[in-house]
Amino acid sequence: LADKLTASVKGISPAGVAQLSQFATSIAFLSQGVPFMQAGQEFLRSKNGDDNSYKSNDATNSIKWSTKLKYSSTVNYYKGLIALRAAHPAFRMTTTAAMKANIKFFKGSDTLIAYSINGKAVGDKAKTIVVIHNADTAGAEFTLPNSGSWNILAKGSQIGTKTLQVLKSGKVVVPAQSTMVLKQ
């Protein structure tokens, strides 16, 4: 993923690669179905642009474990993302009928994907979970579907099972090219 991002986004910085890697992976891991990631993706593994590395040497294909320390914030993001998915059955529905009945998508801009999950109906501790993916290069405002307080579980470069912030208002600003997850 890191190589693809580097090749696709002209002039992207290492921090930009990390942010987009977190964003792209959050989309996959917070979707229904079985998520998948490549070995070393959590620490931005690179094969130096070799897109057909099965024929390449060990220097290209080996996992450089030293980069795990260098990109520890991204490693921690992936850990938090996996923990969040594991803690909430709402992200792991097993039938199409359950998904159709309990996921509601909201209309918005072309750069925003937002949906709510009826957690209560699928045995989740959270009554409602809202996931917002903002692909825009600027922050995006979103109006939450229900009144009351919301616990933010993912915002910017932080994600996990612990509440990052309690929100009392009905609107949030989702940082650029990131995912926000809230629960009630």
Where does each model-flagged region fall?
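Short, flexible beta-strand-to-coil junctions
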Residues: 119-120, 135-137, 154-157, 183-184
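Solvent-exposed beta-hairpin/edge-strand motifs
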Residues: 145-159
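C-terminal beta-strand-rich structural cap/linker in extracellular carbohydrate-active enzymes
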Residues: 164-184
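Short, polar loop/linker segments at the starts of domains and inter-domain junctions
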Residues: 5-14, 159-171
